[in-house]
Amino acid sequence: MRLVLLGPPGSGKGTQAAQMKETLQIPHISTGDLLRSEVVAGTPLGLQAKQVMAQGDLVSDAILIGMLESRLSHTDVVKGFILDGYPRNLSQAAALDGLLAKFGHPLNAVVQLEVPTDVLVERIAGRAQAEGREDDTPDAVRKRLQVYNDSTAPVIGFYQQRGILLRVDGVGRLDEVSQRIAVALGC
């Protein structure tokens, strides 16, 4: 099963992806983790990304899709994968579609974790306080969420048009949300 897990910051994507990895026995591919490991490994794409990040810029879609192409060529993804943190915009969604078409393996489903803004703000602010982060004020969190919503709304529409978007309530205990995802996927 080839899946994308979408959701705003604080929605529990990483937690749910880790749970789904165990349940479905397929790899969890986090673009953030992938980027960091490519940089540490000193791959050509990792070196390009490091140079871009050192200048304070965002890593280009071309570099990210190159890293994904490399990762998706590994044998452990033959039975599927859970992609977390990508795509974040419409051009990335189109690039991912093209890449998966090249491999002959289109996405089976896109799971959108839906969590109300007030719950997200509470989760992130609580996490920030526990970690001693002063930059995650409620106003800063709301701004990040707005940026996420503005860039990701077209992606959600893109997958909804294709009939593979599954909306899942992301509020509740870990096991409750995991169960909702499993039901939505028909597992």
UniProtKB/Swiss-Prot annotation:
Pfam families: ADK (PF00406). Keywords: ATP-binding, Cytoplasm, Kinase, Nucleotide biosynthesis, Nucleotide-binding, Transferase. One of its GO terms (biological process) is AMP salvage. It catalyses: AMP + ATP = 2 ADP. InterPro entries: Adenyl_kin_sub, Adenylat/UMP-CMP_kin, Adenylat_kinase_CS, P-loop_NTPase. It is an enzyme of class 2 (transferase). It comes from the Bacteria. It is found in: Cytoplasm. Residues 30-59 are annotated as: NMP. ATP binds at G10, S11, G12, K13, G14, T15, R127, G172. One of its GO terms (molecular function) is ATP binding. The keyword Nucleotide-binding applies. Pathway: Purine metabolism; AMP biosynthesis via salvage pathway; AMP from ADP: step 1/1. Catalyzes the reversible transfer of the terminal phosphate group between ATP and AMP. Plays an important role in cellular energy homeostasis and in adenine nucleotide metabolism. HAMAP family: Adenylate_kinase_Adk. Belongs to the adenylate kinase family. This is Adenylate kinase. It comes from Xylella fastidiosa (strain M12).
